């Protein structure tokens, strides 16, 4: 790694007439590219985890920090075949035409054979009837991008990546306000052109969403997360 460029007076993204114009760091709540458009970002590298950050479902299931370089969190089902999820209870992300969104995460399952199923992405809190996530179905190792609107699931991209036991995979997408660009291990793999947004019969849901991790084991399989980022433009 080369030496960093030094901005001794700081770096600003604010307009001259704005409150944070002289603030020596980028405005964390607004974007300098378009006046009136803000930004909202959630990141977690899982070197810290507050107990109320995520709600865990599944009898006796846990979502807790584990030893690992850079920090990791492990979703451990409470029993064989116990469907288990960890999700942010307060929803804050929403697809809006014209406003950009970003999502990325790095995960690994301890095993993927048989009927182990899992997904990671954005969901409507406790409800699995709305969301957009990367999913591995039972009896498959294909990781697909799946959108669910009003309980109707649609596979937007098949074969984004291939799941393997105890193997990291980084998944992500970028919604540019019109199209969705899909990534696996930081490489572009697909584009979803002009998905529609709405409450029913559309490609994407218009409800509020938040990060989620889910696994349904067949024995003692776990799902480990290295990091997650969810960000979007917000009209403020």
Each predicted region: which residue ranges?
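Short, intrinsically disordered N-terminal pre-domain segments
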Residues: 1-22, 234-236
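Short, aromatic/His-centered strand-loop micro-motif at the edge of beta-sheets
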Residues: 148-170
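Short, tryptophan-glycine- and acidic/Ser/Thr-enriched carbohydrate-recognition patches
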Residues: 38-62
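Localized edge beta-strand/strand-to-loop motifs within extracellular or lumenal beta-rich domains
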Residues: 167-181
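Secretory/extracellular carbohydrate-interaction modules
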Residues: 76-143
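Short, solvent-exposed beta-strand-to-loop segments that form ligand-recognition rims
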Residues: 160, 187-208
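Extracellular carbohydrate recognition
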Residues: 216-227
